[in-house]
Structures are given as structure tokens and as C-alpha cells.
Amino acid sequence: MQSFSQHGQDAFVYETFFKSKDGQGYFVDVGAYDGVTFSNSLFFERHLGWSGICIEPLPAAFEKLRGSRTAVCLNCAVADRDGKGEFVDVDMPNFGKMYSGLRAEYDQRHVQILNAYMTGARLIEVPLRRLADILDENGVRKIDYLSVDKEGGELKILKSIDLKSYDVRVISVENNYKDAAISDHLLGFGYRLIKTFAGFDELYAK
């Protein structure tokens, strides 16, 4: 079975947690990009028949996403409020627009990287949605695999859902600068850090 994740996260999650799982699973992919490139969720949809939700704010990436996936695809950014927000649309060699993110939550520690490598950037307006509202609208209470890749604001996303009310088994979260607040939050809900991929993509489970 083909792996699609940047560093083999999907294959590791499958082998470690779901290889013997009976029945269909469910994923939520926040920051799904085009649905294929470095995707943490496509493996489960394509090879195992899982259903789920893919969320991507960039209009061009979203058009590719909804053409490549069978999951529910939503064109918005996940935030701690509903409304509209400014989104930094960045072009980077070899990474395309994958360093893009909400302006209000953009990780300023990326700036040095952007100044060195980016070939262009612009501000666009995107819809904002709360993750809890998205889950409730789709009748989702149990998530086998939650993947969060947002270039800043990951902690806000994790705090925006009550992890006591939603049954989330495995969580991948990008933590580029090893912010302790992310691990402290998840450890407080009984999660354990299972593995860190490439020094920045953390995998938690309970």
C-alpha cells in the first residue's frame, strides 16, 4: 500500500494502531492542501475505505482537493471563531503554497525561512469556522485519526474542541518549534507522545 505522508506518518499510524481494526474508520484532516501532496489522510481513504473530513482554505488547492478525494471537503480555515480572516498565501520552491497560513496566527518564526526562499506572497480573505461546529454539523463524535497542519494556530485548534466530549484516538500535529504548550495540553487529556517525525511532526495517542 502506497504511503502519501511526507515522512511516513500514515503507514506508521496504520501499522501501530489500525492494522487489526474491524470496520470503517474516520479521519479529520485540517490543512489538507490538495488532498494528495504529503497527505496524512489519503492512505486511509484510498486503501482502507475510511470516510472523513478534509479542510483547506486556499481556493486553488481546494479545487484540487475536492477533485481528488471522496471525503467531505470544506473550503475554510479552522479558527476559534466564525467569520472571515486574512490568509497569507505563500509560494515556496519545492513546497508550493504549503507554508501559507492565517495572518493573525501565522508563526512568525517562519519569517526567516520565507525571506530566504519564498518567491511570492499575497493576502487573501478566507472563511473561518470552528472545528467543533464542523464536527457537530457532520454528526461526528468519534475520530480515529486527526491530522493538524496549519503553520501556526495548532494549539488554538486543539483547544477549540473539548477532547472529553469527542473521542479522538490518534492526533498528528505539526509542532515546528517544539512548543511545550501543545504537548502539555494533550498530555492533560491523557494522550501520550508516541513518535516525532523529522523533528517537528508529533504523534499522540491514548
Question: Where do the PLM segments sit?
Answer:
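Phosphate/nucleotide-binding beta-alpha loop and adjacent structural elements of enzyme active sites
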Residues: M1-K206
